[in-house]
Amino acid sequence: MDSKTALIGMSGGVDSSVAALLMQQQGFSCMGVYMRLHSVPCGGANHSADAAAVAQKMGLPFQVMDFQDAFQENVIRPFVSSYESGLVPNPCIRCNRTMKFGVLLDRALDMGYRYVVTGHYARIRQEETTGRYLLYKAADRAKDQTYFLAGLTQRQLAHIRFPLGELTKEQVRRLAQDNGLLTAGKKDSQDICFVPDGDYVAFMERYAGKAYPAGDFLDLSGKVVGRHRGAVAYTIGQRKGLGLAMGAPVYVCGKDMVKNTVTVGPNEALFSSALRGCDWEWYPFPALTAPMAVTAKTRHSQNEQPAGVYPEENGFARVEFECPQRAVTPGQAVVLYQDDLVIGGGTIAQAL
């Protein structure tokens, strides 16, 4: 396999366009690929046509590859199942692990390409003494995407390139403008790609072919205080849209999917001093064997919080925060850092 070959995942946006440009400038033999994952229109934009136009301008071979069946199996079905079981999943993390760097990587290797390249903002380095591939934050902290990438395996990192990791977004747009790429001024996408209107409950009802039944709101003592429109419609920490008049603000504190109840309470009831995480991927070492001081994020938008991580049995690890954290939500990712280095990423199994 030629080490200077790369399959470029081109989304039709400016980041993947510049990633393709940089790999070509570095002397790689490249091919552009647009992954067709679903049939949901995204604001009328023709992303595949934009990707094709950029590839044509660069003289790159280009294909649209249909991965809709794999996306249904690996992302949408688990997304719906997780919500129905009371979790709040992050489909972008699962898509990165199973699709962009899962089925697309497998396809790339089968075609003889050494690397899959995307426009993510992150950095990968190989540690000389251990040979392990390490994941680092991007130079542009405001655009860093390591929270969404911390489920990638060593095998995957060995075949991934992130050429934007050392650049700022401003530099990326300038490169696109200087090279006449039509995506230079294109806005970044924000929403879950298969739920562009943000109404994930309506999406799940269409997907599952059913309506989720109404149930009871309970206070912390278990008293019925109102009716809700289906437990799947609520997330931990939610205040808006509850339709409850209780004399003081209340927030979603918990859900019982078997009984179809949603528990509400005051803001102070939302804070947790620790969490238990599962399905960990560790980067400096194969497994956590001793406690470590880290900083932790339980949401992408959150500032890192000082914490300690402690190994537990059966691959679990406990994260204890210096200060209690609000709305720690099972199903979401927890990512641990030391400075720029990602120590590990897992899934929140339980708030403690």
Name what the model sees in each region:
Residues 119-352:
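AMP-forming adenylation/ATP pyrophosphatase catalytic core
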